[in-house]
Regions:
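Bacterial N-terminal signal peptides
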Residues: 7-16
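Sec-dependent signal peptide cleavage junction
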Residues: 15-24
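A short, compositionally biased domain-edge/stem linker segment
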Residues: 23-33
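Active-site mouth of glycoside hydrolases
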Residues: 31, 37-139
């Protein structure tokens, strides 16, 4: 079950990448994992925002501030880059935005918001690590 859910989430997240990602990712062609990690440089964690489990699920941005953090903005991504970071880890907790009919379909508005956050990070010239987080229910 866990394997199938991971595959499903991967397929659903493919559209999250900006259309230009294929063109930009060609820079990594021929690089070893160690070389890519070196390119990624220092990272910053956007924790306790999209992985928070509080807030009203009617508003897909409500959870960002439910654990006391500021709202995610394009300016935040620019500040992260200006502070000297090259990579951002974006942990996301999905279960609050999935259907309860057994299909685990992720709400389109939440997927769109995740896409928006990833695009802001990419526009700030950050590598993005999109992390599935707080999903113990998958077991």
């Amino acid at each position: 079950m866990r394997k199938w859910l991971a595959i499903l989430l991967t397929v659903l997240l493919i559209p999250v990448l900006p259309a230009s990602a294929e063109e930009e990712s060609t820079v990594l062609t021929g690089k070893t994992a160690a070389e890519i990690v070196e390119m990624m440089g220092f990272g910053w964690n956007l924790g306790n925002t999209l992985d928070a489990t509080g807030g009203n699920t009617d508003d897909v941005t409500a959870q960002e501030q439910s654990w006391g953090n500021a709202k995610i903005t394009p300016e935040l991504m620019v500040r992260v880059k200006e502070a000297g970071f090259d990579t951002i880890r974006i942990p996301v907790t999905w279960y609050r935005y999935t259907s309860d009919d057994g299909t685990y379909t992720i709400r389109e508005d939440f997927l769109q918001h995740i896409r928006e956050v990833v695009e802001w990070a990419r526009e700030a010239d950050l590598f993005v690590i999109l992390n599935m987080h707080h999903e113990a229910w998958i077991n």
